[in-house]
Amino acid sequence: MDAGRPEKEGLSPLGRFFFKEWRDIIVDGFIKRKESGLPGAHRIIPSHLALKASPGIKPENILWYEDMEQILRRSERISFMMCGCRGLWRKCDNPVDVCLQVQFPPENGEYKGEAHQYIKPPKDVSFDEALEVINRCENLGLVHIPLNTSHGDLICNCCDDCCMVINPMLNRGGGIIWEILTPSRYRAVVDQELCVGCGTCLKRCKFSAIETVDVPGSKKPKTRIINEHCLGCGVCVVKCTKKALTLELIRSPEHIPTISVMELMSRGRKT
C-alpha cells in the first residue's frame, strides 16, 4: 500500500493545506460511517471490457447497474463534465472531461438520482460517443466509482493521483481502502499457465492487489491475485493480451444497495 504519498506539487500553501486537511477529514468520515454499520459511500463498477473478456460470467448474471454499457443504454440523457479532482490538482495526464452523468427514467413517478449544480455545464453526448469515452478510460486504467447505490447517476473515472476519494485512502495507508471502498461483486483471477509474467497488470493495479511469485518451470515470476485486496475493478484484465486474467463473480446481488441516492446520503448525515 502506497502510504505517505507526497503532497501535490505546484500548489499554493493554501492549496497544500486544503488537500492535507481534506485527506484526513474524508477518511475519518468514511471510518465513522463504517463503524456505525452504514453501507460504504462509494462503490466500484467493474470495467465492462473486463466483463466481456470473462467467459465464466454469464451475461444474465450481470446487473444493469454494474455494467457501464447497460447503464448508458438505460439513460435518457448522457453527459460528461469536468472532473473536479483532476481539473484542480492536474497531477497526471489523464483526460479531465470524463466525469459521467446519466439520467434514468423515474421509478413509480419518483426520481431516485442526485440533483447537481455545475460551475461548467456538462456536455450532452450520444450513446456511441459515451461508450467511446468509457472504453478510452478503461484502457487508460481509470476506475469507475459512483455512490454506493444502484441509482448513482454520477460516475467518476478515477485515477489514484488526483481522486479525492482514492488518494486520501491510499495516503492513510494501513489497508484502509480495502475496508472502506465497497468492491464490485467481482474479483480478478489469473490462469498462471497463460501468464507470461509481463508485469503490465502489476503496474495498472491501484489497490496493491497483485504480486508476482516464482512458479516452477517459469523463467519469469508470474501474477498472483491477493484476493483480500482485490476490489474487482477489472483494470488488470483489460490490458492482459494473453487473456490470463479474467473476472469471477463472488458476491450476491444484495451486495449493492438499491436505495435512492438521497437515502444513502441522509443515512450518512445521521452518524
Label every model-predicted segment.
Residues F30-P183, R187:
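Catalytic cores of enzyme domains
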Residues L142-H151, G175-R204, S208-G232, I250-E254:
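Ferredoxin-like iron-sulfur electron-transfer modules
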Residues C83-C85, C156-C158, C163, C195-C201, ...:
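Short cysteine clusters
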Residues V165-L170, L202-S208, T212, V237-K243, ...:
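Cys/His-rich zinc-coordinating "finger/knuckle" motifs
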Residues D2-I25:
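Short, amphipathic alpha-helical interaction segments positioned at domain boundaries
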Residues M1, L88-R90, R251-P257:
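Flexible glycine/acidic-rich beta-alpha junction loops that bind and position SAM and/or redox cofactors
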Residues K222-T271:
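Flanking helices and flexible, charged tails adjoining ferredoxin-like Fe-S electron-transfer domains
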Residues M1-A3, G232-C233:
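Short, cationic-aromatic polyanion-contact patches
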